[in-house]
């Protein structure tokens, strides 16, 4: 079969890293559509990159040696599981040999209330992840190689790989032992049924043979749960959409800051408008009360003022209010030394009441004489202050 035929469809890389980054890598290119191996090999990272040039892959399943990982089983009740997950390092502090600050803890599996926890040195995990990043292939998952073995109820799974025996126990934890002493390890604990995916050793009379395969092929075929990924917590992979946004991070930050400024300015502007509207509403009420002091309830000054104007136009009031207000405005404008302090309208008496301030008696008298051309003005009060004169005038319409 030609290479073009082999590489048609989707391919996935199954990669096993070594304990030492200087050691050779192992890989297998798996055809997802045909469920078969396209090529296998071992060597350096550079040699693998050369292979990937001929066999492009969509993703990689990465296995790391279980000899660098320890497994523990903890009881995590469902009611408080979220809180206990954060406390796992302290729960295992007495069982690990290193400082927990130097260790990474990842939950591999949950079975009822029991959790399988993998512990690995942070420095070792960072080295593996750096290799994956250098390779440049999207990583589907990073798991201890023993987790590629199927988990069976009341039975172990076993496979031989490079002078190591890998065991996955029915509890979910894993073990790795060299071929020359694995029997001694197993002799110290009761042994259930063992499903063996390698040729069964002659001494293992109770082991149950399974279809013989190799570790990388088994890892390609098995359904690896995403929960078994060692990349948890601070090492959790960045989601693709977040990765795509990283180049735009500074632009998005600047845009967010600008939007916040615009929003803040808009909120402040609307608040100022509200303050101004409230001020003028109160001012209109104040002016209306001065014009119509007999009215105790002012709900809508504008509507109430329009009602009064309509009554005036209809002849309800004998005092032509609008015309007289225009004349009063002209009088104030003609006498610059006189200022109007307050104005009120007594509807029952049909008269305007003014409170005036002038710089002298002469100016106040001049204003009064000019106003007499349009109004009846009974004697009013005037008093001299330190630097001005204050007066009260009542204006009534001419008969």
UniProtKB/Swiss-Prot annotation:
Sorted UniProt keywords: Cell inner membrane, Cell membrane, Membrane, Protein transport, Transmembrane, Transmembrane helix, Transport
Any single Gene Ontology cellular-component annotation: plasma membrane
Membrane-topology descriptor: Single-pass membrane protein
Subunit structure: Type II secretion system is composed of four main components: the outer membrane complex, the inner membrane complex, the cytoplasmic secretion ATPase and the periplasm-spanning pseudopilus. Forms homodimers. Interacts with OutM/GspM. Interacts with OutE/GspE and OutF/GspF.
Organism this protein belongs to: Dickeya chrysanthemi (Pectobacterium chrysanthemi)
Function: Inner membrane component of the type II secretion system required for the energy-dependent secretion of extracellular factors such as proteases and toxins from the periplasm. Plays a role in the complex assembly and recruits OutM resulting in a stable complex in the inner membrane. Provides thus a link between the energy-providing OutE protein in the cytoplasm and the rest of the T2SS machinery.
Phylogenetic classification of the source organism: Bacteria, Pseudomonadati, Pseudomonadota, Gammaproteobacteria, Enterobacterales
Pfam families membership: GspL_C, T2SSL
The name this protein goes by in its record: Type II secretion system protein L
Membrane spanning stretches: 248-264
């Amino acid at each position: 079969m030609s290479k073009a035929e082999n590489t048609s469809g989707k391919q996935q890389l199954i990669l096993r890293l070594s304990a030492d980054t200087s050691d050779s890598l192992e890989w297998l290119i798996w055809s997802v559509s045909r469920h078969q191996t396209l090529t296998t090999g071992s060597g350096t990272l550079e040699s693998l990159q050369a292979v990937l040039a001929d066999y492009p892959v969509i993703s990689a399943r990465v296995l790391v040696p279980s000899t660098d990982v320890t497994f523990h089983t903890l009881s995590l009740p469902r009611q408080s599981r979220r809180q206990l997950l954060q406390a796992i390092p302290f729960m295992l502090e007495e069982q690990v040999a290193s400082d927990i600050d130097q260790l990474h803890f990842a939950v591999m599996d949950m079975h009822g209330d029991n959790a399988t926890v993998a512990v690995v040195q942070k420095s070792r995990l960072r080295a593996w992840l750096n290799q994956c990043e250098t390779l440049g292939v999207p990583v589907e998952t990073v798991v201890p190689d023993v987790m590629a073995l199927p988990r069976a109820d009341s039975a172990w799974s076993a496979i031989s790989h490079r002078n190591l025996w890998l065991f996955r126990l029915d509890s979910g934890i894993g073990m790795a032992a060299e071929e020359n002493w694995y029997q001694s390890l197993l002799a110290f604990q009761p042994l259930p049924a063992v499903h063996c995916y390698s040729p069964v050793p002659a001494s293992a009379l109770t082991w149950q043979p399974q279809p013989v395969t190799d570790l990388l092929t088994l890892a390609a075929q098995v359904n690896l749960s995403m929960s078994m990924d060692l990349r948890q917590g601070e090492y959790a992979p960045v989601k693709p959409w977040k990765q795509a946004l990283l180049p735009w991070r500074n632009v998005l930050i600047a845009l967010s800051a600008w939007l916040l400024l615009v929003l803040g300015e808009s909120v402040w502007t609307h608040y100022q408008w509200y303050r101004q509207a409230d001020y003028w509403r109160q001012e209109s009420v104040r002016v209306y009360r001065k014009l119509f002091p007999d009215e105790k309830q002012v709900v809508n000054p504008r509507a109430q003022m329009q009602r009064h104007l309509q009554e005036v136009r209809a002849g309800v009031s004998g005092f032509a209010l609008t015309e007289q207000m225009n004349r009063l405005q002209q009088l104030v404008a003609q006498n610059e030394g006189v200022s109007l302090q307050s104005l009120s309208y007594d509807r029952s008496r049909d008269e305007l009441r003014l409170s005036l301030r002038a710089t002298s008696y002469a100016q106040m008298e001049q204003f009064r004489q000019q106003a007499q051309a349009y109004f009846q003005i009974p004697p009013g009060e005037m008093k001299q202050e330190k630097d001005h004169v204050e007066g009260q005038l009542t204006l009534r319409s001419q008969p």
